[in-house]
Amino acid sequence: MENVFDYEDIQLIPAKCIVNSRSECDTTVTLGKHKFKLPVVPANMQTIIDERIATYLAENNYFYIMHRFQPEKRISFIRDMQSRGLIASISVGVKEDEYEFVQQLAAEHLTPEYITIDIAHGHSNAVINMIQHIKKHLPESFVIAGNVGTPEAVRELENAGADATKVGIGPGKVCITKIKTGFGTGGWQLAALRWCAKAASKPIIADGGIRTNGDVAKSIRFGATMVMIGSLFAGHEESPGETIEKDGKLYKEYFGSASEFQKGEKKNVEGKKMFVEHKGSLEDTLIEMEQDLQSSISYAGGTKLDSIRTVDYVVVKNSIFNGDKVY
């Protein structure tokens, strides 16, 4: 891999506009059997999503993935969501008790619409075995597997039965995998996405490194079906994190899934904690993302998300912000 690049190195090139207003542009996306309002999903992290936010997202036709850090609550969560006619979308790990959990779901005839196998290094036999286990016991569930960063990994997980793969090793704002281990897609996440997407035959979820709404459009251009976002969704009124006041400003905590705050111990730590400025309501952020993406589609010369996939682009090394600090 030479000529790698990241989000801030790329500018998409406009094509002739065919709409009178950006409101004519359609940002919806289909993943599995369901259609969603935006190709965006809040990260399945404890300071980003909880039951209340999951319910809000599902009711308003946004995709969501519940985190896996309160495993005992998952069964009641699935029941609760499905009893309201909403989709149930959960996360699992790969430890022994997760195998039992999947069998328990099957025994109780509970089939979540989406199951995300969520571990830091998803190119592993542990993940392959779990994909096969879920497909055997819950064949109707749509399985997202990750996280990975290479075409080989995408192909192997797809071949094992994954319905989608999640791409991104350590590019997140509160992820320190790149620093602690020397490995990952941090700094070249967009190029890694492009590399993986070329090998994929099923949808890819780009996960990590998104710092602006324009990065969503860039992810679509380079092959993502859905884009997972953490830091841009942190710090909202509804966010689960704790609120603190500093110098008269409100902040909310945001921490990585493998951080000591998450694990309750300082062992194999690959995440950190930060405080992000309070952002107001989640609804406002989602509306702004939709409007910005509608504008992206109009610049791409189309009316649908797919029009972004065919635009030209240039690589401008680290200069698109001209020294402006946008994040």
From Swiss-Prot:
Enzyme class name: oxidoreductase
Transmembrane found in the keyword field: no
EC numbers for this chain: 1.7.1.7
Xref: SUPFAM superfamilies: Inosine monophosphate dehydrogenase (IMPDH)
Source species, domain of life: Bacteria
GO terms assigned for molecular function: GMP reductase activity; oxidoreductase activity, acting on the CH-CH group of donors
Active site as annotated: 175 (thioimidate intermediate)
UniProt binding sites for NADP(+): 204-227
PROSITE patterns assigned: IMP_DH_GMP_RED
Catalytic activity: IMP + NH4(+) + NADP(+) = GMP + NADPH + 2 H(+)
GO annotation (BP), single: purine nucleotide metabolic process
GO cellular component: cytosol; GMP reductase complex
Function: Catalyzes the irreversible NADPH-dependent deamination of GMP to IMP. It functions in the conversion of nucleobase, nucleoside and nucleotide derivatives of G to A nucleotides, and in maintaining the intracellular balance of A and G nucleotides.
Family designation: Belongs to the IMPDH/GMPR family. GuaC type 2 subfamily.
Record's protein name: GMP reductase
Record organism: Bacillus cereus (strain ZK / E33L)
